[in-house]
Amino acid sequence: MAIVKCKPTSPGRRFVVKVVNKELHKGAPHAPLIEKKSKSGGRNNNGRITTRHVGGGHKQHYRLVDFRRNDKDGIPATVERIEYDPNRTAHIALLCYADGERRYIIAPKGVSAGDQLIAGALAPIKAGNSLQLRNIPVGSTVHGIELKPGKGAQIARSAGASAQLIAREGVYVTLRLRSGEMRKVLAECRATLGEVSNSEHSLRSLGKAGAKRWRGVRPTVRGVAMNPVDHPHGGGEGRTSGGRHPVSPWGFPTKGAKTRGNKRTDNMIVRRRK
């Protein structure tokens, strides 16, 4: 994987920084594992905008990714290829199991075409293998972690993400997340060894506003540029700073205000994130 800085042959290419991976599959995705993906333009069934800054963008197909891997225990799989997925920052890997079935998984870092992967309690400690947390050694790096047994991976799924298993006590294990948070998870939950691929994703630069539009992201208008009817920061004579602590268009504090409200699982968090 290489970081390529484009030559400034035009204003739109002057600031472009690409992440080039020559191992990525250049053809179409595996047809049985794709589904139609409709665009909402950020509107709900009443046609009203419920999510701002959404609309347009290139047409995409959704890739059906296996986040559970619990019904293929003990069946070895070969990595056929690594693919780009427009629906996520990580790359995906197409596995061909010994029984002939093919499935997509989140591609772990260091896994390439031809590698052998397996899931289950007897799987060796190797990047890309999926085990229950009770069977993973303390100190290991993991990703694709379940919060409820059998529900599928929910933690550490984006490019370069991972967590470290730092303790095992009774029916729980303790994980240290990239955010600095330490939390307990049931040892029955599954995780995949290693970290997620495409860790260089954060080093790229789109270079121009149009590249953001290709991805279906519309412009964000500053509150201080609006009228008072549209935003709490709006109005004023000339250019103003808003005159109050930063808030959302609905008056809720923004820029760092804590929004977590799930008291039911507070006891699972050993240390809050930084």
UniProtKB/Swiss-Prot annotation:
Question: Looking at the record's lineage, which domain of life comes first?
Answer: Bacteria
Keywords from the named record: Ribonucleoprotein, Ribosomal protein, RNA-binding, rRNA-binding
The protein's matches in InterPro entries, at most eight in alphabetical order, are given as: NA-bd_OB-fold, Rib_uL2_dom2, Ribosomal_uL2, Ribosomal_uL2_bac/org-type, Ribosomal_uL2_C, Ribosomal_uL2_CS, Ribosomal_uL2_dom3, Ribosomal_uL2_RNA-bd_dom
Q: Pfam families from the entry?
A: Ribosomal_L2, Ribosomal_L2_C
Enumerate the SUPFAM superfamilies for this protein: Nucleic acid-binding proteins (SSF50249), Translation proteins SH3-like domain (SSF50104)
Tell me which SMART domains the record gives. Ribosomal_L2, Ribosomal_L2_C
Region Disordered, annotated ranges: 28-55, 224-274
Q: Name one GO molecular function term.
A: rRNA binding
**GO cellular component, as recorded:** large ribosomal subunit
Instruction: Spell out the Gene3D superfamilies in the cross-references.
Output: 2.30.30.30, Nucleic acid-binding proteins, Ribosomal protein L2, domain 3
Example GO biological process: cytoplasmic translation
- Family to which this protein belongs: Belongs to the universal ribosomal protein uL2 family.
Query: Sorted alphabetically, which PANTHER family does this protein's record hold?
Result: LARGE RIBOSOMAL SUBUNIT PROTEIN UL2M, RIBOSOMAL PROTEIN L2
User: Which proteins does it associate with, and in what oligomeric form?
Assistant: Part of the 50S ribosomal subunit. Forms a bridge to the 30S subunit in the 70S ribosome.
Its function, per the record, reads: One of the primary rRNA binding proteins. Required for association of the 30S and 50S subunits to form the 70S ribosome, for tRNA binding and peptide bond formation. It has been suggested to have peptidyltransferase activity; this is somewhat controversial. Makes several contacts with the 16S rRNA in the 70S ribosome.
**Protein name (database record):** Large ribosomal subunit protein uL2
